[in-house]
UniProtKB/Swiss-Prot annotation:
<keyword id="KW-0808">Transferase</keyword>
<dbReference type="Pfam" id="PF03726">
    <property type="entry name" value="PNPase"/>
</dbReference>
<keyword id="KW-0460">Magnesium</keyword>
<dbReference type="GO" id="GO:0000175">
    <property type="term" value="F:3'-5'-RNA exonuclease activity"/>
</dbReference>
<feature type="binding site">
    <location>
        <position position="494"/>
    </location>
    <ligand>
        <name>Mg(2+)</name>
    </ligand>
</feature>
<dbReference type="InterPro" id="IPR020568">
    <property type="entry name" value="Ribosomal_Su5_D2-typ_SF"/>
</dbReference>
<dbReference type="InterPro" id="IPR004087">
    <property type="entry name" value="KH_dom"/>
</dbReference>
<dbReference type="GO" id="GO:0006396">
    <property type="term" value="P:RNA processing"/>
</dbReference>
<dbReference type="GO" id="GO:0003723">
    <property type="term" value="F:RNA binding"/>
</dbReference>
<dbReference type="InterPro" id="IPR015847">
    <property type="entry name" value="ExoRNase_PH_dom2"/>
</dbReference>
<dbReference type="InterPro" id="IPR036612">
    <property type="entry name" value="KH_dom_type_1_sf"/>
</dbReference>
<keyword id="KW-0479">Metal-binding</keyword>
<dbReference type="Pfam" id="PF00013">
    <property type="entry name" value="KH_1"/>
</dbReference>
<dbReference type="InterPro" id="IPR036345">
    <property type="entry name" value="ExoRNase_PH_dom2_sf"/>
</dbReference>
<dbReference type="InterPro" id="IPR004088">
    <property type="entry name" value="KH_dom_type_1"/>
</dbReference>
<dbReference type="GO" id="GO:0000287">
    <property type="term" value="F:magnesium ion binding"/>
</dbReference>
<dbReference type="Pfam" id="PF01138">
    <property type="entry name" value="RNase_PH"/>
</dbReference>
Length: 699
């Protein structure tokens, strides 16, 4: 059994500690990794044998947060962790993306990676810690893996790049970029930025990749010291004669495929050709051990190679476009009459129906994370139903991909969203992907920008998104603009960029091959900018600025400021005043400790009524002023009259009339409206009123 090993190294402003051989020793490998008191236990387990009929790589990555890590109890009735949170799902994807390409081609053994957060420092996000731990565990294990990888978070504060900034530092940063890669290649980038230039983003990528070499160097040192020998596995042998025969058959029919630029027609033609070839091959190999699955696998490979070769040799793409051509765009806004804002964005065969709902602070999402409760007043949800690609499937809770695409679209919009002072609404956006042929997350960003403008949300600028692709063979490469799903599938890079005319708001990059240079990334960024500006030109022809008025179906929010000392008067004893106020005016009233009162109403007149009542309640009674009041109580020596929605004063019997009155009830009745003049307010706040000398006809 391995004796425990502790390895430490400095990483930016933090110290990383790798503990190997202490915990979870029955896994293929386990590492307890810490960075400034944020600790993640990472385990990796693999099966030595392939499951029967297995034909894909079953990698599962689970990132999970334990509330005890922050000294907290889980919420809910059962007081234990349940289904993964959105953050856990997103971090699982963040770990999966850079490690998946580094397993050997053809390797299809089961592999499970589990990263469990067991201690958390609120200033250190566990995601980078988890990626470092996963890299170390896979590299040290006997599982075939071409690592290690590094990971870094890059901030941009006061025009300086900052390695692994703290949570506090990140709140003042114009950039939140996570990058992961090997010693020579970048594999994954995920970023959110405040309208930074292409050069600033590229420099951040270079900075992050250079800095993470510290992690790779230290893991390599550990591997040399205690790394296990990788176990052998049997890669399925390719039937060379079958592959050659299929290549001849496919090439003879390939030109028939490229006659069809429409996705459905092309797929139908491809399926027809493949069926013909399968039938031909099975008849030719009647006595050989060849099955249909093997034939289809090779045909799919040949199809991909054919498309790649066609693009590299400067021929048209599979849908007839040149390298930099954007698909035809069609836009409609305000198409859902009862929603608060809507847009239909169509780009080629990809379509997003986007709806906006405006709500109050009460509609905001309270997220109880490891580092505390935070309030999110901008929600963006992405739905990808099976019908959008012409398939039948199960419809239920959002899958990992939907959660990830929704978060990417949200990141693309955050830089231009108004703050609560500028627009005091909670905003929910839902993007329904009704057709899909690539770049649906980027279509969601375009549709969201349009729908928010239609809803009258004062976003700072229009935002568009585009997905770029790469085909690379040796030193030859082509960067493609606005890729379709087939190009994404056979390509070497998925590069999504969103932004306004002023700069980039979000970037997501996944690379499937080696040899991606900074020059290639720079070219992709420049081409993405050109594509983005073209899309914005089309969007601005439909709607250039946010509507001045919100929908008549949306709630109106009005704010008034009162003396904080008067808040208790608005609330009343046991909430009696505010309760009656909301019921009578059919409004929602929220009161803040600083004296800001927000009135939410669908009816403007009701809102005015509530504001008038609140102003009356919080107004100071002035001596000598005349008020309209209501008789609330009658006694022998006079009557109590309520003025200014709740303040009560006494009209003595001698102050009711110029004439002598023997009985108050002969002159006044309960509920009667009267005009009264304030005579005096004593030290105890008691108000003396008079009806004498006040003309009562107008009361």
């Amino acid at each position: 059994m391995l004796d425990p090993i502790i390895h430490k190294f400095k990483y930016g402003q933090h110290t990383v500690i790798l503990d190997i051989g202490t915990i979870a020793r029955q896994a293929n490998a386990a590492v307890m990794v810490s960075m400034s008191d944020t600790t993640v236990l990472v385990t990796v387990v693999s099966s030595n044998q392939v499951r029967l009929e297995q034909d894909f790589f079953p990698l599962v990555v689970n990132y999970q947060e334990r509330t005890y890590a922050a000294g907290k109890f889980p919420g809910g009735f059962f007081r234990r962790e349940g289904r993964p949170s959105e953050n856990e799902t997103l971090t699982s994807r963040l770990i999966d993306r850079p490690i998946r390409p580094l397993f050997p081609k053809g390797f299809i053994n089961d592999v499970q990676v589990v990263a469990t957060v067991v201690s958390v420092n609120p200033q250190v996000n566990p995601d980078i810690v988890a990626i470092i731990g996963v890299s170390a565990a896979l590299s040290l294990s006997d599982i075939p893996f071409f690592g290690p990888i590094g990971a870094a978070r890059v901030g941009y504060i006061k025009n300086q790049y900052v390695l692994n900034p703290t949570t506090t530092e990140l709140s003042n940063s114009k950039l939140d970029l996570v990058i992961s890669g090997t010693e020579s290649n970048i594999l994954m980038v995920e970023s959110e930025s405040c309208l930074l230039s292409e050069k600033e983003i590229l420099d951040a990528i270079i900075f992050g990749h250079e800095q993470q070499q510290i992690v790779i160097h230290n893991i390599n040192k550990l591997v040399k010291k205690v790394g296990k020998t990788k176990y052998s596995w049997n890669e399925k042998e390719v039937n060379i004669s079958l592959k050659t025969y299929l290549s001849e058959l496919y090439e003879s029919r390939a030109q028939d495929i490229y006659c069809f630029f429409d996705k459905k027609e092309r797929h139908a033609q491809v399926d027809s050709i493949k069926k013909d070839i399968v039938k031909t091959v099975l008849n030719s190999y009647q006595h050989a051990a060849v099955d249909e699955k093997e034939i289809m696998y090779l045909l799919n490979y040949l199809e991909a190679q054919s498309i790649r070769y066609r693009i590299l040799t400067n021929k048209l793409r599979i849908d007839g476009r040149s390298q930099d051509t954007i698909r035809k765009i069609d836009i409609k806004t305000g198409i859902l009459p009862r929603t608060h804002g809507s847009a239909l964005f169509t780009r080629g065969d990809t379509q997003a129906l986007v709806a906006v709902t405006l709500g109050t602070e009460r509609d905001a999402q309270n997220i109880d994370g490891l580092t505390g409760i935070r309030v999110d007043r901008f929600l963006l949800h992405y739905n990808f139903p099976p019908y959008c690609v012409g398939e039948i499937g199960v419809i239920g809770a959002p899958k990992r991909r939907e959660i990830g695409h929704g978060r990417l679209a949200k990141r693309g919009m955050l830089a231009v969203m108004p703050n609560a002072n500028e627009f005091p609404y909670t905003i929910r956006v839902v993007s329904e992907i009704t057709e899909s042929n690539g770049s649906s997350s980027m279509a969601s960003i375009c549709g969201t920008s349009l729908a928010l403008m239609d809803a009258g949300v004062p976003i700072k600028a229009a935002v568009a998104g585009v997905a770029m692709g790469l085909i690379k063979e040796g030193n030859d490469f082509v960067v493609l603009s606005d890729i379709v799903s087939d190009e994404d599938h056979i390509g070497d890079m998925d590069f999504k960029v969103s932004g306004s005319r002023q700069g980039i708001t979000a970037l997501q990059m996944d690379i499937k091959t080696d040899g991606i240079t900074y020059d290639i990334i720079n070219i992709a960024l420049k081409k993405a900018k050109n594509a983005r500006l073209q899309i914005l030109d089309v969007m601005e022809q439909i709607i250039k600025f946010p509507n001045q008025e919100i929908s008549k179906f949306a709630p109106r929010i009005y704010s008034i400021k009162v003396n904080p000392d008067k808040i208790k008067d608005v609330i009343g004893k046991g909430g009696s005043v505010i309760r009656s106020l909301t019921e009578e005016t059919n409004t929602i009233i929220d009161i803040e400790d600083n004296g800001i009162i927000k009135i939410v109403a669908l009816d403007y007149d009701k809102a005015k009524q509530a504001i008038r009542r609140i102003n009356d309640i919080t107004a100071n009674v002035e001596i000598g002023a005349v008020y309209t009041g209501k008789v609330s109580h009658i006694v022998e020596f006079g009557a109590f009259v309520t003025i200014l929605s709740g303040k009560e004063g006494l009209v003595h019997i001698s102050q009711i009339s110029e004439r002598r009155i023997n009985k108050v009830t002969d002159y006044l009745k309960l509920g009667q409206k009267v005009l009264v003049k304030v005579l005096e307010i004593d030290r105890q706040g008691r108000i003396r009123l008079s009806m004498k000398g006040v003309h009562q006809v107008s009361a």
